[in-house]
């Protein structure tokens, strides 16, 4: 399995160092790694082999090897393959939900307010944000992948791409409008980094 590093990661590190937010960036990257391991574990359980893991500024991305030697069999079982891909896509956000639930339980029933110097509230909030962001119906985010696979099962691959692309574009336009408003209203340039 190959490990690839996008050079923009170092730019993000520099920005978060300069703004003294490196602790938050480190937390988000750790949570993103755990999130991505959810995809890897689900993929392995469902019979896929991880080909590469890319480290990108906003986290990690795993690519699975698509074995095409039994292509006709895959076409016959296309719906099962699409369902497996949807399960793999949901596995990452599901990991964030589990971490968030455990954090909430720790926060409610114990006196623990920090884990390794990180406040439980920040852990809950970070996992919630990662979950919400990844479940947006924007391809190639997890929500977009799930949408594509579910539409694929019902209407076929071509229609799945068309519908997913249209929904992705609409959601991106809406998010860009909200982000533009937020930048103007709150004068927070960090929102630009999120959009990029």
Language-model features, listed with the residues they occupy:
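Small-residue-rich helix-interface/hinge motifs
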Residues: 3-5, 17-76, 122-126, 130, ...
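Short, amphipathic, aromatic/basic-enriched membrane-interface segments that mark the entry/exit
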Residues: 1-4, 90, 156-166
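Metalloprotease/metallohydrolase-associated module, dominated by Zn2+-dependent proteases
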Residues: 1-2, 74-136
């Amino acid at each position: 399995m190959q490990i690839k590093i996008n050079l923009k990661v170092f730019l993000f590190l520099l920005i978060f160092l300069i703004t003294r937010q490196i602790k938050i960036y480190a937390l988000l990257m750790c949570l993103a790694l755990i999130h991505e391991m959810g995809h890897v574990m689900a993929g392995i359980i469902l019979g896929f082999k991880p080909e590469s893991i890319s480290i990108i500024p906003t986290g990690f991305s795993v690519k699975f090897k698509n074995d095409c030697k039994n292509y006709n069999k895959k076409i016959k079982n296309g719906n099962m393959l699409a369902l497996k891909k949807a399960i793999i896509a949901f596995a990452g956000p599901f990991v964030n939900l589990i971490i968030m639930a455990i954090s909430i339980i720790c926060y409610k029933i114990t006196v623990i307010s920090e884990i390794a110097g990180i406040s439980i509230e920040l852990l809950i909030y970070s996992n919630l944000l990662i979950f919400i962001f990844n479940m947006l119906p924007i391809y190639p985010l997890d929500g977009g992948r799930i949408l594509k696979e579910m539409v694929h099962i019902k209407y076929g691959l071509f229609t799945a791409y068309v519908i997913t692309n249209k929904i992705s574009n609409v959601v991106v336009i809406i998010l860009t409008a909200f982000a533009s408003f937020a930048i103007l209203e709150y004068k927070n340039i960090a929102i630009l980094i999120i959009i990029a």
